[in-house]
A protein has these predicted regions:
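A conserved beta-turn-beta hairpin within the catalytic core of GNAT-like acetyltransferases
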Residues: 71-82, 91, 110-113, 237-245, ...
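A conserved beta-strand-loop-helix scaffold within acyl/acetyltransferase catalytic domains
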Residues: 27-54, 59, 65-76, 202-251
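Short amphipathic alpha-helix that is part of the acyltransferase structural core
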Residues: 1-43, 50, 54-58, 63, ...
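Conserved acetyl-CoA-binding loop-helix of GNAT-fold acetyltransferases
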Residues: 92-109, 249, 255-268, 291
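A short, internal acetyl-CoA/4′-phosphopantetheine-binding micro-motif in the GNAT/acyltransferase core
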Residues: 81-91, 120-123, 247-255, 284
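Short hairpin/turn module used for nucleic-acid contact or packing/dimerization
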Residues: 255, 260-311
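A structural microfeature
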Residues: 65, 149-152, 232, 299
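Acyl-donor-binding surface of acyltransferase catalytic domains
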Residues: 1, 101-177, 301-307
Length: 311
């Protein structure tokens, strides 16, 4: 007879074991390939500014499933399930259900009244559940979660020199220079101004994502400025090396062509790092990315929520 499943809290020394399990349990090759980055952003990095709990499911001595959850840094009554991964041969055996039930209890102990199966920016690996992880969608519905939003990524093809995503920006940069606008790579010394600009102009958590893009391996940021005044930025790699974003242009500079230049500078960096495609994450302006980089909608995510029963 199979050993029973036990759920225990994970300790930081188990990060390598969690990465190894995710490499085997994440069905989509692009996710499995970035398992180390995914675990890093959702656990050690996220724990720097929020409560994060890791749970492991064991059958006997074997780790067969993991869950990472966190409390919203802006609303302590909201918790997020950031990752659930179960080995293929352990699915449909109650492992995911047991992990999620324990996560709800752990989050409730921390004052959470509503749980989201959705990204918790600025430290997230997906906006929600990729629809191709169909068993996870079915499990969410069976456990009483309701879908309340849909999000999508766009894919930029970096696999060949003539890709629209890799078009030269030299002529556009010359035109901008004639107007006194400089475009360059951001450096760590730029972070105070960049994060203040992102926070004041766009709000949300973009300041945190920009901070996670500068001075880190596999990440980067480019900016546009005039007379020391920031006009826009584009970043990549904050959540995952293959993901682009966020990007923002000051309202006064919209229509200047800054956005397309910054975007393609980042995409060229990603190609130089060996990527043959980039994910433009949690996209808003679909027509802009389609026109500027030939990007297409590809990954689609369902975001779920559930109000926990009163104690």
């Amino acid at each position: 007879m199979d050993a029973e499943i036990t759920i225990t809290e994970l300790t930081p020394d188990l990060v390598p074991a969690v990465v190894g399990l995710c490499e085997r349990a994440l069905d989509l090759a692009e996710d499995a390939a970035e398992a180390a980055a995914i675990v890093d952003v959702l656990w050690p990095r996220a724990a720097a500014d929020r409560q994060v709990v890791g749970l492991g499911a064991r059958r006997g001595a074997d780790l067969v499933g993991v869950l990472l959850c966190s409390v919203s840094p802006t609303d302590p009554g909201v918790g997020h399930v950031d990752l659930v991964a179960v080995l293929p041969d352990e699915r449909r055996r109650g492992v995911g259900r047991a992990l999620l039930a324990r996560a709800e209890a752990v989050l409730a102990e921390r004052g959470v009244s509503e749980v989201l199966l959705a990204g918790n920016p600025p430290y997230y690996a997906w906006p929600g559940i990729d629809v191709r992880y169909t068993p996870a969608v079915c499990a969410a519905l069976a456990l009483g979660y309701r879908q309340d939003r849909t999000a999508w990524n766009m894919t930029a093809d970096l696999s060949y020199d003539a890709s629209l995503a890799l078009r030269s920006t030299e002529a556009a940069e010359r035109r901008l220079a004639e107007r006194g606008i400089t475009v360059r790579r951001a450096e760590p010394a730029d972070l105070p101004a960049l994060t203040a600009f992102a926070r004041a102009t766009f709000g949300g958590t973009w300041d945190g994502e920009v901070a996670g893009s500068v001075g880190r391996t596999g990440a980067g940021c480019h900016l546009a400025e005039r007379d020391g005044e920031l006009l826009g930025f584009a970043a990549y790699g904050s959540s995952r090396p293959s993901w682009f974003g966020p990007m923002g242009t000051a309202p006064a500079a919209e229509g200047s062509g800054i956005g397309g230049v910054l975007l393609r500078r980042c995409l060229r960096d990603q190609r130089a790092a060996g990527l043959d495609r980039a994910q433009i994450g949690w996209v808003g302006p679909v027509p802009f990315y389609s026109g500027s980089a030939g990007a297409r909608i590809e990954r689609v995510f369902f975001l779920y929520r559930r109000t926990l029963p009163a104690a």
